């Protein structure tokens, strides 16, 4: 069973989406104007190992599994960590495209995003230390439908590229501190 078999997507009209996006933008603007410290968010996610290489991830009230295919010692019971990473990039792109389409008054009827990432597993398995452990290249294809000109959609792309948090995470170095505790 996949998560999609138990998930029902709420339907929303374009006008309801526009209202939500506008309200959220206004509310955040007011919070930040009142105190710039309100702009800082800390996300907390927890994970625990199960089975061969499965991870059970808890993010607030949401729980999901992460696994690997058999060739990487997994049971292929869920998407892999790098597939979730690409999924996070795709979902953030969709959110920011919606947000900036609304802000720039650019009509987007439908959005479809596809991602491909190239990963050289030699570093993962300790075969070659000179190659990168993560993706060597990622390709995103964003397909937008609607009545706008190509120039308007390129304007939207530029805004999304400049403001997408997960794209920023992939394209710029982010300090990461790892602490190991004995339990």
Predicted region positions:
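Extended beta-strand/beta-hairpin segments
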Residues: 1-87, 99-183
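Alpha-helical metal-binding/catalytic segments enriched in His/Glu/Asp
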Residues: 88-93
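Aromatic- and glycine-enriched beta-alpha-beta binding-site module
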Residues: 94-98
